[in-house]
């Protein structure tokens, strides 16, 4: 009888871990397109980042008036961005809810405390090198 109980507890613990690490992706403004973002694309985004705990803003490209440019899926941004911005159309907007495992983990960075869940409002402005008529 002990083996099934231990197995059940282990299964519940592992299920809890996988749920804790789930990335939330909500499309807030959908767009139809022929060409969506893929791993390796260089993209330009606008974003606003806030802490889930209290809603305080820690960064926003909108405030600077300058989009953020990076290569998607190359590990140059947090894992939540590399995964949460795939299959996106130019003009689409998404809200990403990024748990610590997909963000900055226990270490934090700057105004972001360790263990923080992050909320990013994102907008895809451009997939570099893709002509507008192919979008």
UniProtKB/Swiss-Prot annotation:
Catalytic activity: [protein]-peptidylproline (omega=180) = [protein]-peptidylproline (omega=0)
Acyltransferase is among the record's keywords: no
Gene Ontology BP term (one): cellular response to farnesol
Compartments where located: Endoplasmic reticulum
Enzyme class: isomerase
Motif (Prevents secretion from ER): 132-135
Similarity annotation: Belongs to the FKBP-type PPIase family. FKBP2 subfamily.
Protein name: FK506-binding protein 2
Organism placement in taxonomy: Eukaryota, Fungi, Dikarya, Ascomycota, Pezizomycotina
């Amino acid at each position: 009888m002990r083996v099934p109980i231990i197995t059940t507890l282990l299964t519940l613990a592992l299920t809890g871990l996988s749920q804790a690490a789930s990335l939330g992706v909500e499309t807030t403004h959908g767009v139809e397109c022929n060409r969506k973002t893929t791993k390796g694309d260089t993209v330009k985004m606008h974003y606003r980042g806030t802490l889930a705990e209290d809603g305080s803003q820690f960064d926003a490209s909108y405030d600077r008036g300058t989009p953020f440019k990076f290569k998607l899926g190359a590990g140059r941004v947090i894992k939540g961005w590399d995964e949460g911005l795939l299959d996106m159309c130019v003009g689409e907007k998404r809200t990403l809810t990024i748990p610590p495992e997909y963000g900055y983990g226990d270490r934090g960075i700057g105004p972001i405390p360790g263990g923080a869940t992050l909320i990013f409002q994102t907008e895809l402005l451009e997939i570099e090198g893709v002509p507008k008529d192919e979008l």
